[in-house]
């Protein structure tokens, strides 16, 4: 493919509105262009990368018997009313009317559509299982699109749906998809973790998220590629190294979610779902009597603890939530933070929000800072974190402004439902007892769910079982964010390329180091002087030889300065660069491996053989 024939509008500077490196490089390297807020055009390079990823997916899904189809993006609102999601999905749903004033939506996901198609066509358990998927643009009216392709209003997604006559059959397909996803993301060159996830608006119970890890850019050996003109990091002057470190740190670490994972086992979970090892403790101290104490001007746990000279771990944090219009009191040990996802899931609530100061005062008779679980109205629902039941003689709010109660003992002074509703902390023991928890940021690239009968129940999707009884179809759902794969790969494979000029100056610039499986082309073939006929002829021969061996080749045939060609090559990020330069008449070309910065001169006749050796090594 001739570079002069492609639309690759590279920029000399990073875009000023980009906050994450993937967004900046996709724009600067000519992969994407924003058409309007949250809506992007995928230019030829991005489209080739996405198509390569689609090929990987199709190959892996074929192995597990998944069949591709295509559903409409424009959906009747009646389907979503049938499932109940038309009203509950929220403001992110694109709603529109046709000329007949009928309601439609632009699909953000397609559970209802696939459920309807199968409901109308499948009548017996003998027709199951079915395993269907599509690759399609989706739509979500994001309030604040940001970070390039990570949070957009239009995005490309692979969504799959499986249909079963029982849960045992669903379990088999769910495991097939889990393994297929691991194979897909491994082939794509991603550093990822499969983690315990939350089903959220999708419904369902068991779910697993696949998160591309986005580590901090502190490891120079990982993030910096040195040109052959620089022997090692030690050769770079200290002040230049400091500039390089500052440049690495200048870009925000992307990743919507925090992951908690074990240092010594396979345990990993979204922070919203993460838990830790818990061991109930036996009470050894005698229980004191309740005593009301004045705590003037103390509104926070740390202020109360300091005023009463107690540790924060001996205090009870009392919060009030409204769950589906009902008040719920939540209790935590004072130095812990509430995990609202855990609380919402435990309550099986559709809506959960913190109560206002006015609602708290109406319920407790006091304002924030003085709330507590003692002497609440009969029938009050109290959900306490499991650590609270280990407390003896704790401090809690007295439900009286400016006062607290000491000597509070769970069981004696209040009754509660005990469950894990706290946010875990780094360094705590993993729930499997192996290793401690560490945190990392991550980008969600895939999510699989066991939906069960969530949609078949609401939409009447039933089959006749072995006993001719009508039973709901059991479903699974499997998504991959195709367009955000591009962002995730660049976040992990962006590199700062450093070189030394003949005058001894150090220069550095960002570029992409694409893994081979997803690079838009395998080889960047550059002719230094397009007016040199010998070089042109050698380039044409090498291009033909490479393509005959199955390499995708991007040939830079532009009449541009060699410096511009090399800069664009670093930006675009193909794994291999072959330069036909001053030694073309001698049949000598230069090979550069992008990942390491290593380069070597070889006879053009040995190019293919040398590339095969080098690519095996790297």
Swiss-Prot record:
EC number(s)? 6.1.1.15
Q: Where are the transmembrane segments?
A: none
Principal place where this protein is found?
cytoplasm
Which principal EC class is assigned to this enzyme? ligase
Q: Where in the cell is it found?
A: Cytoplasm
Database matches in InterPro entries: aa-tRNA-synt_IIb, aa-tRNA-synth_II, aa-tRNA-synth_II/BPL/LPL, Anticodon-bd, Anticodon-bd_dom_sf, Pro-tRNA-ligase_IIa, Pro-tRNA-synth_IIa_bac-type, Pro-tRNA-Synthase_IIa_type1
Catalytic activity reads: tRNA(Pro) + L-proline + ATP = L-prolyl-tRNA(Pro) + AMP + diphosphate
Gene Ontology, cellular component aspect: cytosol
**Which keywords does this Swiss-Prot/TrEMBL entry list?**
Aminoacyl-tRNA synthetase, ATP-binding, Cytoplasm, Ligase, Nucleotide-binding, Protein biosynthesis
Origin, by domain of life?
A: Bacteria
- What is one GO biological process annotated to this record? prolyl-tRNA aminoacylation
Which GO molecular function terms does the record list?
A: aminoacyl-tRNA deacylase activity; ATP binding; catalytic activity, acting on a protein; proline-tRNA ligase activity; transferase activity
A Pfam family annotated for this UniProt entry: tRNA-synt_2b
* PROSITE patterns documented for this protein: AA_TRNA_LIGASE_II
Q: Which family does it belong to?
A: Belongs to the class-II aminoacyl-tRNA synthetase family. ProS type 1 subfamily.
**Any idea what job this protein has?**
Catalyzes the attachment of proline to tRNA(Pro) in a two-step reaction: proline is first activated by ATP to form Pro-AMP and then transferred to the acceptor end of tRNA(Pro). As ProRS can inadvertently accommodate and process non-cognate amino acids such as alanine and cysteine, to avoid such errors it has two additional distinct editing activities against alanine. One activity is designated as 'pretransfer' editing and involves the tRNA(Pro)-independent hydrolysis of activated Ala-AMP.
Domain remarks: Consists of three domains: the N-terminal catalytic domain, the editing domain and the C-terminal anticodon-binding domain.
Q: How does it assemble?
A: Homodimer.
What is the protein's given name?
Answer: Proline--tRNA ligase
Q: Which organism is it from?
A: Streptococcus pyogenes serotype M2 (strain MGAS10270)
């Amino acid at each position: 493919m001739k570079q002069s024939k492609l639309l690759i509008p590279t920029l000399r500077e990073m875009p000023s509105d980009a906050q994450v490196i993937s967004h900046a490089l996709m724009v600067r390297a000519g992969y994407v262009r924003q058409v309007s807020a949250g809506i992007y055009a995928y230019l030829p390079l991005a489209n080739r990368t996405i198509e390569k990823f689609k090929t990987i997916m199709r190959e892996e899904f074929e192995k597990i018997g998944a069949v591709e189809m295509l559903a409409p993006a424009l959906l009747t609102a009646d389907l979503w009313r049938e499932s109940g999601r038309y009203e509950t999905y929220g403001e992110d749903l694109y709603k529109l009317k046709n000329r007949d004033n009928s309601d439609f939506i632009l699909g953000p996901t397609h559970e209802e559509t696939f459920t309807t198609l199968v409901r109308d066509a499948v009548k017996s358990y003998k027709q199951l299982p079915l395993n269907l998927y599509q690759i399609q643009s989706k739509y979500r009216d994001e309030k604040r699109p940001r970070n390039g392709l990570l949070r957009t209003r239009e995005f490309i997604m692979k969504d799959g749906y499986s249909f079963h006559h029982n849960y045992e059959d669903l379990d088999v397909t769910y495991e097939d998809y889990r393994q297929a996803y691991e194979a897909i993301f491994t082939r794509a060159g991603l550093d990822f973790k499969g983690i315990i996830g939350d089903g959220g608006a999708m419904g369902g119970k068991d779910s697993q998220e696949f998160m591309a890890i986005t580590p901090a850019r502190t490891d120079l050996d990982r993030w910096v590629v040195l040109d052959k003109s620089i022997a090692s990091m030690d050769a770079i002057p200290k002040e230049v190294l400091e500039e390089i470190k500052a440049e690495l740190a200048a870009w925000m670490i992307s990743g919507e979610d925090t992951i908690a994972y074990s240092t010594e086992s396979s345990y990993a979970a979204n922070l919203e779902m993460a838990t830790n090892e818990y061991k109930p403790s036996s009470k050894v101290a005698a229980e004191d009597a309740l005593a009301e104490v004045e705590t003037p001007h103390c509104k926070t746990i740390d202020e109360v603890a300091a005023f009463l000279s107690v540790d924060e771990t001996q205090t009870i944090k009392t919060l009030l939530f409204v769950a589906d219009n009902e008040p719920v009191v939540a209790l935590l040990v004072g130095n812990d933070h509430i995990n609202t996802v855990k609380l919402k899931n435990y309550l099986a609530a559709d809506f959960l929000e913190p109560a206002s100061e006015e609602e708290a005062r109406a319920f407790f008779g006091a304002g924030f800072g003085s709330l507590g679980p003692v002497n609440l109205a009969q029938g009050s629902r109290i959900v306490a974190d499991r650590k609270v039941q280990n407390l003896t003689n704790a401090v809690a709010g007295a439900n009286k402004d400016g006062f607290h109660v000491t000597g509070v003992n769970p069981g004696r002074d209040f009754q509660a439902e005990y469950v894990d509703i706290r946010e875990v902390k780094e360094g705590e023991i993993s729930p499997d007892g192996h290793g401690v928890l560490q945190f990392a940021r991550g980008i969600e690239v895939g999510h699989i769910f066991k939906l069960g009968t969530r949609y078949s129940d609401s939409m009447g999707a039933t089959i006749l079982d072995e006993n001719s009884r009508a039973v709901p179809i059991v479903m699974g759902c499997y998504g991959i964010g195709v367009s955000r794969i591009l962002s995730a790969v660049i976040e992990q494979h962006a590199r700062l390329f450093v070189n030394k000029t003949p005058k001894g100056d150090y220069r550095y610039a960002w570029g992409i180091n694409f893994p081979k499986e997803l690079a838009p082309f395998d080889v960047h073939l550059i002719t230094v002087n397009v007016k040199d006929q010998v070089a042109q002829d050698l380039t044409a021969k090498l291009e033909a030889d490479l393509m005959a061996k199955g390499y995708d080749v991007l040939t830079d045939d532009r009449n541009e300065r060699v410096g511009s060609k090399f800069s664009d090559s670093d930006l675009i990020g193909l794994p291999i660069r072959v330069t036909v330069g001053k030694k073309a008449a001698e049949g000598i070309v230069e090979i550069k491996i992008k990942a390491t910065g290593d380069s070597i001169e070889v006879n053009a006749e040995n190019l293919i053989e040398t590339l095969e050796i080098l690519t095996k090594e790297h």
